[in-house]
Design a protein with these regions (language model features):
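Compositionally biased, low-complexity linear motifs
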Residues: 42-58
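Extended catalytic/binding region for NAD+/ADP-ribose chemistry, centered on the ART fold
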Residues: 22-47
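Conserved NAD+-utilizing ADP-ribose enzyme module
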Residues: 47-49, 60-225
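Short, flexible loop/turn elements at secondary-structure junctions
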Residues: 10-11, 37, 60-62
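ADP-ribose/NAD+-binding catalytic cleft of ART/PARP-like enzymes
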Residues: 1-26, 46, 54, 219-225
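A broad, low-specificity signal marking well-ordered, structured residues that form hydrophobic/aromatic
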Residues: 4, 31, 53-54, 154-155
Length: 225
């Protein structure tokens, strides 16, 4: 099964290097792509520089794909991977306890996957996750918040085997004046919707991290689906 994917960057990348990148990205070191060319253009531009949506084709047959949106996983599986790779402020006792419990209970062997598909935690979305482990929002609110702004999914190449199946097809240029404005608007929209619609809209019966900890909830709990 072949898929077309895009990588947003400030330069053209004909041959991505395996093992190159920042270890503190959402899923650790990897080549971060999307199946949406417009999203790649937003990711590639900066306020003062143009960008590129590098286009590739990848043959997925024979590769192990961890799709965090599949029915067998919950938002807490995604959050646990994020906690392992990103720097969260867990100085508060609740956040520290939440991190420890999630790491012990919802940890996945994601490093053995060739490809990971899941949410991208840009600044706004990272703050949503932080609010959850600090008890400021419920699990329902977290799940809803991750869909604000329609950020979409990342398609991340993690293994050498995945890199070997990648073929460069070309690139599309992204003008900073056009695409940075769209990028900023998407982020601002997500923040505004979060504050207006989600953060202060508690519902009776909402599930908070304190309940998850107190009841020692497990991944198969139907309340997490």
């Amino acid at each position: 099964m072949e898929k077309t994917i895009y990588h947003g960057s400030d330069h053209i990348i004909e041959k991505p290097k395996f093992g190159y990148g920042k270890p503190y990205n959402d899923y650790g070191i990897g080549f971060y792509c999307t199946q949406n060319p417009n999203m790649a253009k937003e990711w590639g531009v900066g306020i003062d520089h143009n960008g590129y949506a590098n286009r590739y084709e990848i043959e997925c047959d024979g590769l192990t794909i961890l799709d965090l949106n599949a029915p067998g996983y919950t938002m807490l599986h995604w959050l646990t991977i994020l906690l392992e790779n990103r720097e969260f402020d867990t100085s508060a006792p609740l956040a520290a306890e939440a991190k420890e419990y999630l790491m012990n209970t919802f940890h996945l062997d994601y490093k053995s996957a060739d490809i990971i598909i899941g949410y991208r935690a840009e600044d706004s979305y990272f703050s949503f996750a932080s609010d959850f482990i600090n008890g400021a929002i419920s699990y329902r609110q977290l799940c809803n918040a991750m869909r604000l702004g329609k950020l979409g999914q990342q398609f991340v190449l993690k293994s050498k085997a995945a890199f070997e199946q990648l073929e460069f097809l070309g690139y599309e240029t992204a003008d900073s004046k056009e695409w940075y404005k769209k990028k900023a608007f998407r982020d601002q929209t997500a923040r505004r919707q979060y504050l207006d619609v989600e953060r202060n809209r508690r519902q009776r019966g909402d599930l908070y991290i304190t309940t998850i900890l107190d009841e020692e909830m497990k991944p198969d709990d139907p309340r997490l689906r």
